[in-house]
């Protein structure tokens, strides 16, 4: 299966700016044990027997679900105002048996007018994950102006710092959800203006 702008637009609901695709990435999927274990298997595991990093995953399931819910709320805000076609990878509904998750993320970023990596504080620090790293490695040089990394002010990560230096990545912080939404709206608006002026190529 080939992931294209047309495929993405076709699978998303309609908004004012259907052709302005804003891909939202977050840490929820990489750390969600539902992808690996059944409910029965999770119930049988004694959390105290697990090594530290895995113990964190089990203890913070609610926070991981909240991270996904946060992305959904942000998506709704951006689709309402300014009306851009904000989406999560799950919305395009491409089976990972057909295209693996990392390749999907790279292609969604390549097809999108804007991409944001959103990293809330989950009670501990994780890296940005394999998908984000692969996206940056593949597309930072050609799509760097369309990428932003926004993390909650409590998040400290060596990978974020190195990504900023290595790929000249735009990094923003936020303290409240309202501030996060405002920054993403400004980012989308800035890209729209640059496309209209011809500073950035139009993708259609």
In which residue ranges do the predicted regions lie?
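Conserved catalytic or regulatory cores that recognize and/or transform ribose-phosphate-containing ligands
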Residues: 1-204
